[in-house]
Amino acid sequence: MVDIRPFRAIRYTAKAGELENLITQPYDKITPQMQWEYYARSPYNYCRVILPTEKNRYEAAQQRVRNWLLEGILAKDEAAAVYVYTQAFTVNGETYTRTGVVAACRLYDFSENTVFPHEVTYNMPKQDRLNMMRAVKKNLEPISFMYSDPEGKTRRVLSEAASAAPIITVQDSFGVKHTVLQVADMNVVSSLQKIMQDKTLVITDGHHRYESALKYRDEMRASTNWTWDSAFNFHMSYLVSCQEPGLVVLPTHRLLRRVTLTTEHLSRLHMFFNILPLEPSVSAIEAYLAANRGRNAFAVYTRGKAYGLTLKSHAQIAPLHTSNTSEETRKLDVVILRDVIFNHVLNTGVLNLDEDILYERWTKDAVNRVDSGDANVAFLLNPIGPETVWRIAQKHERLPEKSTDFYPKTASGLLIMDISPEEKL
C-alpha cells in the first residue's frame, strides 16, 4: 500500500526575485562551474542551500533556510495540497511533456515490497544527504518514483485540476519549462490516494536520498515521541506513471580516469566483441550507437581514436557474470560493460566515484572530458527503457551505479517539505 499525503510546501516568495534566477539542477548534477554560476545569479539561489561552498556546509544550509524563512524569502503554504508538476522539454530534436504529482509519500523499507530500488548506491552521497537532513530538517529535493497505471486513472484525476491557475511557471537555463499547480481540493486528493494505495513504486531518481531518509526516519523514531503522521515518516516525492509518454531515459556514459586503453586491451576485447574503427567525432559515435540500438553495443573514445564494439555471443561471456541475476539483467549493456569490459578485460577493481570513474549524460561532454585530460577513456552506451527498469526492479535486482538518467530532472528550489519533529501530515 502506498500512502501519499498532501503537505504545506515551503516556496520562494516574490521577495526572493525572479524564479529563473533561483532554481537549480539537483545537487548531484551541479558541476563546480555550475555552482559558481548559480551563486552569481542571486544571493538567494537554491544552490546556496543544497550545495553550499562553505566548509561547514550543513550548518550554512541550515542557517540560510532559517534566515530566509524569517526574512520572508521563503514561506510555507497556508493549506496542505498535492502539486501537479509538468515539464515541457526537447531532447534529440523531439518535444515531450511529462506530468506527475508531488506529494508526501510514506517511507517503506525495501523488505516491505512497496518501494523498489533499481540501482546500486555509493556510501559517500548517502552520508552527505543524511548530514544535510539532520541539519536542515527539510526535504530539500523530491525523490522521483514511477508506478504502473496502464488504465490512465491518475491522468484522468489530474485533468480535473488542469483548469486551475499555476502557482509556478518558469523556464530553466536548459530550456525546460516547469509548471506547478496546487491542488488543495480534498476530493481530488482522496481520489489520488485511493488510486495509489494498491500501487508499488520504483525509484527513478534519488536512491541515495531515499536510503538516507530511511536512516533519518529511524533516528527520529528512536529519539522523539512520534506518531505514524509524523512528517519524517514521509518524503516529498514526485510520482509519474511509467506509461507517461514524456518519461524519457537517457544513458549515463562512463569515463575512466586512471585506466588507459592499450593495444593489449583491444586484443582482449576482440575475444568478445566485433570491433569497428570509428571516426573520432561526436556525430560518428552517436550515429553508431543509434544504428545498433537493440544490440549489445558500445562506443569507446580515447583521445583521437574511437571504436564501436558489438557483442559476439552471450554464451561466451556467461561465465564472466559475477552476480546472481536474471538472464534479462545479464543481457543489459551496463551489466556487460561492468562484468566483461571493466572487471575482466580492464581489471579495474573497485571504481571510486570521482577518483576513478566519472559519469556524463551527453556524448559531447564525455568526449570533451577525455580531450581535456580529465579522463583517459570514455565508454558510451544506449539508454535502457523505463519498462525494462520496472521489470528488473520488481525482481528485486539492482543495476550498476548510475545505469539510468531519467530526463529531465525535477528542478530544485520549487518546493520544500518540512520534516521537523513537530510537523504532522
Task: Please report, for each region that a protein language model flagged, where it lies by residue.
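Surface-exposed, charge/polar-rich loops and edge strands
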Residues: 1-425
